[in-house]
Amino acid sequence: MSVYKYTNFIVQNIDQLFHTDFGPFHLLLPIGLSFYTFQSAGYILDVYWNRCEPEKNVFRFALFVSFFPQILQGPIGRFDRLTKTLYAEHEFDWQRIERGVQRIIWGFFKKMLIADTAAVFVDAIFNQYQTYNGIAILGVLAYSAQLYADFSGGVDVVIGVAELFGVEMDENFKRPYFAVSITDFWHRWHITLGTWMKDYVFYPVSLSGWMGKFGKFAKKKFGKTYGRALPICVANLIVFLVVGIWHGAAWKFIVYGIYNGVIIAFSGLMTKNYREWKKKLHIDDKSTGWHIFQIIRTFLLVNISWYFDRADTIPQALTMMKNSVTHFEPAQILNIQFGQMNLKYTPVFIAVLLVCCAICFVVSFLQERGTKIRQSLSTKIWVIRWAIYLAMIFAMPLLGRMPDTAGGFIYAQF
């Protein structure tokens, strides 16, 4: 995986540093390389650490690694959980089929009516950020909607397809934009990557001998409180450096990972101070106002990281961040053109995007409050259920506005 994904990045930086001309190399990247590499590596480590029994049947192991729905963008399956239903015998179950179809439709609804519609807007602003410098902040907000709808929608389709076959896969999202901290966000966003990093990077690093020595040194130097927190902070920084590198071979992704790691590490160091400040300011942790403030604060911090994730370069990301706070011309949104016929991004397009985002928000809000949407829908008579399904299916081609590059999923490139 390292050879395929990072050779050209290393060669490019060597060429720039020493003024040579070694690359680039034109390597054919296998589909889903990162996902099945991590899945296989997790299995090998679980067997090595005696967490699971080795699979002696090579065909069953091949099925675990190459189960087709998850190849492109996960979720990253764990052997002990995925194989419980993957290797089991299955019988035809109409209710299970309907639930799978239901999940697939919801995934494509998010992908086609939110992600692909927002992509028109996002691509124009980020690709021509100097032209549309007055709506940079709207571009990153639209990207936050696009990325979530694209990735979570794709995973919904994957889980739905697996459900058709009676296979249960791990959930990969848990309403991440309702997170109250960056740490909480990463417990809700790309969950299977987070748990993989926790089990196979964070714990081995934080429990290593050199980290133990560093912890003892930190306690002597900074006291017990910071001495305990510093090793965890260093381990988190290493984890998110790896996360950034995993996302792509570019400095912007390394900055993206370090940014998240620094915030989480700093939060860990300041935990005691936060408690004291909240006590002095008489802040009630359980109050609705404080909860909403935490959600908004976290959402803004996450969106800062999206600048680096979506921009082509670090200077572009910094320029757009600057424009977001110094220059705002919302009227520029109506001048955006897309497609070969240079169509305009009309108020109708904007209304469709906002309404679909509102639907997704309401569903997520109800789920966050504990409402079982799918169970509630299953109690309705079949006419109502299928009327909803068909309405969503017909809405996709009629209301969706797809860019020339539409068709794939963003995380399939990783």
Q: Where are the regions a protein language model picked out?
A:
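Membrane-embedded transmembrane alpha-helical bundles that form the catalytic cores
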Residues: 1-363, 367-413
